[in-house]
């Protein structure tokens, strides 16, 4: 099937992974053995509505993935009622919600570490959203690659980014 970036094509990809024997895992779940594990994530930069539609496809196939919501998205407000409803709808289908962090430049001016800013943002947003203990950095700097956090999982830890095959469809590629 030719890549069309449609929901039908996406369903085909998920079915193919299932038929190949992949087990879909959450980033925060313990891994096991040398089995074929797939860590599926969606950085929701633009459309929560499309995220709900993708979550429906995955739920229909019995697959769980992690949806990373972007608190400072110029397109949607994660604290708006409609956005919260969509995020809760995704979580109700069995998917995990993570925080997609776009580090503000102000942390450097305030002499804060990336870890301090990350925990501060996570602690604030988990008051309103059903967050799993996992973060993904928006447009990650070299500083976050390989960085381990004490009580949160970073999707750019080596075990997800360097130690296993990493595939991305960012920028439609």
What do the predicted segments below correspond to?
Residues 2-89:
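Active-site beta->alpha N-cap acidic-glycine motif
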Residues 7, 19, 64, 97, ...:
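Generic intrinsically disordered, low-complexity segments enriched for polar/acidic and small residues
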Residues 20, 90-93, 127-129:
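A structural motif corresponding to the C-terminal end of an alpha-helix
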Residues 42-45, 101, 139:
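Active-site metal-binding loops of divalent metal-dependent hydrolases
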Residues 75, 103-173:
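Catalytic domains of cell-wall/extracellular-matrix polysaccharide-remodeling enzymes
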């Amino acid at each position: 099937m030719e890549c069309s970036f449609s929901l039908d094509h996406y369903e085909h990809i998920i079915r193919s992974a299932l038929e190949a024997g992949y087990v879909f895992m959450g980033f925060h779940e313990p891994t096991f053995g040398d089995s074929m594990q797939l860590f599926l994530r969606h950085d929701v930069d633009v459309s929560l509505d499309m995220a709900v539609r993708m979550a429906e496809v995955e739920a229909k196939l019995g697959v769980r993935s992690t949806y990373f919501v972007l608190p400072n998205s110029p397109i949607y407000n994660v604290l708006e009622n409609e956005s919260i409803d969509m995020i809760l709808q995704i979580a109700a289908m069995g998917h995990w919600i993570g925080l997609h962090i776009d580090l503000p430049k102000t942390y450097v001016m305030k002499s804060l570490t990336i870890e301090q800013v990350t925990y501060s943002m996570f602690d604030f947003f988990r008051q309103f959203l059903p967050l799993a203990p996992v973060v993904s950095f928006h447009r990650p700097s070299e500083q976050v690659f390989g960085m381990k956090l004490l009580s949160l999982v970073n999707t750019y830890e080596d075990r997800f980014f360097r130690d296993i095959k990493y595939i991305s469809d960012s920028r439609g590629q």
